[in-house]
């Protein structure tokens, strides 16, 4: 019901077209199927991840749902292509990104900026949208934290990207950004079917008809996470003055170093993975005086480039 409240105004009298590639057994994708049925949507299933872009030109999706890793890869590929451009084309791309982020943040554009943005729309954003079928109205990210820089970048180049939040125990969506009111640093307002509050220690608590009855044959584990009807998510967050939910950390993943400092590994891991040369990263440093990063590179040939990137981050 909460998802329908967001999507119905977006499509009005049109029937949405989905292109999906996530496993149908995944709780996120499983919930999306119910949304598709409720909307009477046309659904295309991608042949494979490798053929996703070519499938987009055939399906011409108006909406796609995916996990953050997909958007991270998309960002890396587009950014790599942009970085190869020179001269006027490079300046136009730079203006597209900066003015797009300004519009995303509801900042007023000057007369000159509006003039430049007109050409950015025609010469850059429209071409990018056409590569994705030309009809895309929303990417929806869920199943993990989407890096703010990636969200801003995709929105700025004409690919509207909404970040949502949920967990399997909440069937599985709790909140999502609203088209036209995107606050990319948040996961949007909670659905009206949910009650959300922040505990004294900062943990996000959720209550509603979408909360699970419990873990199958595991009463002890159930009682640990559901107390007085409130699901203890294990995530740390806050509610902004606009009423949006903002995730700041994962309760059990906080690193406490030898000096007693609390460090969020996910923020550092996301920063590392912004490099197109880094496939995955893992940060460790509990009860240590230092942090260690375990990095999976795209290929062994990228070692020197990764070292240069890390040196830049450490400055």
List PLM regions with ranges:
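Phosphate-coordination loops involved in phosphoryl transfer and adenosine-cofactor binding
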Residues: 15, 136, 201, 228
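Conserved ATP/PPi-binding loop(s) of AMP-dependent carboxylate-activating enzymes
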Residues: 159-160, 183-192, 199-225, 244, ...
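Conserved ANL (AMP-binding/adenylate-forming) active-site segment centered on the GW(Y/F)…HTG consensus within
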Residues: 111, 115, 181-184, 211-234, ...
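Conserved AMP-binding/adenylation subdomain of ANL enzymes
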Residues: 1-20, 24-125
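Thr-Gly-centered strand-to-loop micro-motif
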Residues: 21, 46, 141, 163, ...
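AMP-binding/adenylate-forming catalytic core of the ANL superfamily
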Residues: 198, 208, 213-214, 236-315
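Gly/Ser/Thr-rich phosphate-binding loop
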Residues: 62-65, 77-182, 279
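Active-site glycine-centered loops adjacent to acidic/histidine catalytic or metal-binding residues
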Residues: 23, 143, 166, 188, ...
